[in-house]
């Protein structure tokens, strides 16, 4: 890439520190989102595994009444022929087992693509954050002692 295609702009130390802070916030938000997506993918995998193992039904099962499994009730599960799948906006659709599995796989694939995009963006921002932080540290070390003391007082 030519130098003419890149713009060069000098920023103040204060602007660099502000950018560093904003980048840190963005990195934290991206990291939290990445974790949420990873958890959701793991949940979908667990549901897919459960549907596979319960295909023929089960004599004894424990069904959680809440998301954390704090309260469980014993149950028997019939052969899984029709399953209710959340279609969005609090709408559930009754589908056969294969269609439910297809839905789960499609959702996992979409989330995996999103996870990949967010992970690449996180890596890009982390690299920029590291470079900016190094530049700030170099500037602070190169600053005259008087400027350093003024900076630390702010």
From Swiss-Prot:
The alphabetized list of GO BP terms reads: protein folding
Q: Which InterPro entries match?
A: PFD_alpha_archaea, Prefoldin, Prefoldin_subunit_alpha
**GO MF annotations for this entry?**
unfolded protein binding
Tree of life domain: Archaea
Would you tell me the Gene Ontology cellular component terms?
cytoplasm; prefoldin complex
Instruction: Supply the SUPFAM superfamilies for this chain.
Output: Prefoldin
Q: Which UniProt keywords apply?
A: Chaperone, Cytoplasm
Where in the cell does this protein reside? Cytoplasm
Instruction: Provide the family line.
Output: Belongs to the prefoldin alpha subunit family.
The entry describes its oligomerization and partners as: Heterohexamer of two alpha and four beta subunits.
UniProt function note: Molecular chaperone capable of stabilizing a range of proteins. Seems to fulfill an ATP-independent, HSP70-like function in archaeal de novo protein folding.
Q: What is this protein called?
A: Prefoldin subunit alpha
Q: Which organism is it from?
A: Hyperthermus butylicus (strain DSM 5456 / JCM 9403 / PLM1-5)
Question: In the record, what lineage is assigned to the organism producing the protein?
Answer: Archaea, Thermoproteota, Thermoprotei, Desulfurococcales, Pyrodictiaceae
């Amino acid at each position: 890439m030519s130098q003419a295609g890149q713009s060069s702009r000098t920023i103040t130390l204060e602007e660099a520190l502000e950018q560093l802070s904003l980048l840190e916030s963005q990195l934290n938000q991206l990291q939290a989102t990445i974790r949420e997506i990873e958890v959701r993918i793991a949940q979908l995998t667990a549901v897919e595994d459960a549907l596979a193992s319960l295909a023929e039904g089960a004599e004894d099962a424990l069904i959680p009444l809440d998301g954390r499994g704090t309260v469980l009730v014993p149950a028997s599960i019939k052969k899984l022929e029709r399953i209710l799948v959340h279609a969005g906006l609090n709408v559930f659709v009754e589908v056969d087992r294969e269609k439910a599995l297809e839905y789960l796989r499609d959702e996992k694939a979409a989330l995996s693509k999103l996870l990949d995009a967010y992970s690449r963006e996180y890596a890009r921002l982390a690299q920029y954050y590291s470079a900016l932080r190094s530049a700030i540290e170099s500037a602070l070390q190169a600053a005259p002692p008087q400027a350093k003391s003024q900076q630390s007082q702010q």
